[in-house]
Design a protein with these regions (language model features):
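Solvent-exposed loop/turn segments at secondary-structure junctions
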Residues: 91, 105-109, 135-140, 178-182, ...
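Serine-hydrolase catalytic machinery in alpha/beta-hydrolase-like enzymes
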Residues: 70, 74-173, 190, 232, ...
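Secretory targeting and sorting signals
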Residues: 1-26
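Active-site rim elements
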Residues: 142-146, 255-266, 330-339
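The feature captures the conserved acid-bearing segment of alpha/beta-hydrolase catalytic domains
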Residues: 196-294, 300-306, 316
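Primarily recognizes the serine-hydrolase "nucleophile elbow" in alpha/beta-hydrolase
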Residues: 115, 119, 163, 170-218, ...
């Protein structure tokens, strides 16, 4: 990994909002979110009682995999793709370890995202493998459409990791920022039978056409002052100044119609969270709210055990990763970052409470 990382223009951490806020193809309204769904399965099981499940890679070959961070390449759908892989000291090739898929934001790219989330370093301490893949396009992004080549790549990436490393397939998780949070939502849908839990940061979404075979526990984070993916729904002003996805040098706002530029299209974060709760079989009553810091409220939806759905709402928070010192250092780009909670710590504790229950696969 290069030792110097440029942050100018970093970027457009939230812009793929354009793909969901400016068209009806990537989000679904809460009112019809269950229209084509089967009833989600929920299992109330003590997480400590869920055994580790060895991936096909467990054995002598996995034991020889180098620890630490490497940049890996692979082919998916005929395309050359790459990703960063962080193998923790705890990986011995025979004892399965958890895996976290960590997805970058629009124009952010995998290298910057390593700094933003800090999950690779955090994973070394906690004992999980971290995969940080690169998206596609002149302006790196993810196509969140179900069945897209990007989703195929991520499925192939999980297959590759599980065949090369000793992974606990009951403890495979996904997180991401902004467009990476959009993709986190899509991954949780398309790979519903292998993703144990999800943690979108600054961009939870409902995905059009998604049907759940099982409930997917979800913990989300979003700032009320986000100027990219706005809390109330739609494009923020800063999103309009982001680079267009075609690499033409134009701004995103230049590629939109006047109506699109002024529209507050797209569901609000509370509406999206309510839709996730509904998918997860939660009761149709108001969530409870608990102030856990001066600027952070934990919003807990009334869900059955094993289908928990939680939002950490950051008052005046920006398009940022809570607890990230890197995020805090680029306040001029992403807005305020709360340091009163740490998203890595919260999502990891949530993940460990929500392994994939074999009976619900």
């Amino acid at each position: 990994m290069r030792s110097i990382v440029r942050t100018s223009g970093v970027l457009a951490l939230g812009a793929v909002l354009m793909l969901s806020a400016c068209s009806s193809g990537s989000t679904a309204k809460a009112s019809n979110v269950n229209a084509r769904e089967v009833k989600a399965k929920v299992a109330a099981v003590d997480p400590a009682s869920v055994p580790m499940a060895k991936s096909s890679g467990c054995g002598a070959g996995a034991a020889g995999i180098a620890k630490g961070q490497t940049k890996e390449t692979m082919t998916s759908g005929g395309d050359a793709r790459w990703y960063f892989r962080q193998v923790p000291p705890a990986h011995d090739g025979t004892t399965p370890v958890p895996l976290v898929l960590d997805l970058h934001g629009y124009s952010e790219g995998a290298q910057i995202h390593l700094l933003m989330s800090g999950l690779s370093t955090f994973g070394d301490a906690k004992g999980f493998v971290t995969l940080t893949p690169q998206g596609t396009g002149p302006v790196a992004r993810w196509d969140t459409t179900l069945g897209s080549k990007d989703l195929k790549f991520l499925g192939d990436l999980l297959d590759t990791a599980e065949s090369q490393l000793c992974i606990d397939t009951n403890r495979v998780f996904v997180t991401g920022l902004s467009n990476g949070a959009f993709m986190t939502s899509a991954v949780a849908c398309q790979f519903n039978d292998r993703i144990a839990a999800a943690a979108p940061v600054a961009g939870v979404r409902t995905i059009k056409g998604c049907t759940f075979k099982r409930s997917v526990p979800l913990v989300a984070f979003h700032g009320t002052g986000d100027q990219y993916v706005t809390f109330d729904g739609g494009l923020g002003q800063k999103a309009l100044d982001l680079p267009a996805p075609d690499g033409s040098g134009k701004k995103l706002g230049d590629t939109l119609t006047p109506a699109q530029r002024t529209a507050r299209s797209g569901d609000s974060i509370p509406t999206i969270m309510a839709a996730w709760a509904k998918r997860n079989g939660c009761a149709a009553t108001l969530p409870t709210e608990d102030a856990i810091a001066t600027d952070v409220t934990k919003v807990t939806y009334p869900c059955p055990k094993g289908a928990e759905t939680i939002l950490y709402r950051v008052t005046s928070g920006g398009h940022s990763w809570p607890g990230s010192t890197f995020s805090q250092s680029i306040v001029n780009i992403v807005g305020p970052t709360t340091m009163n909670v740490n998203a890595d710590e919260i999502m990891w504790a949530f993940f460990m409470q929500h392994p994939l229950i074999p009976a619900t696969k």
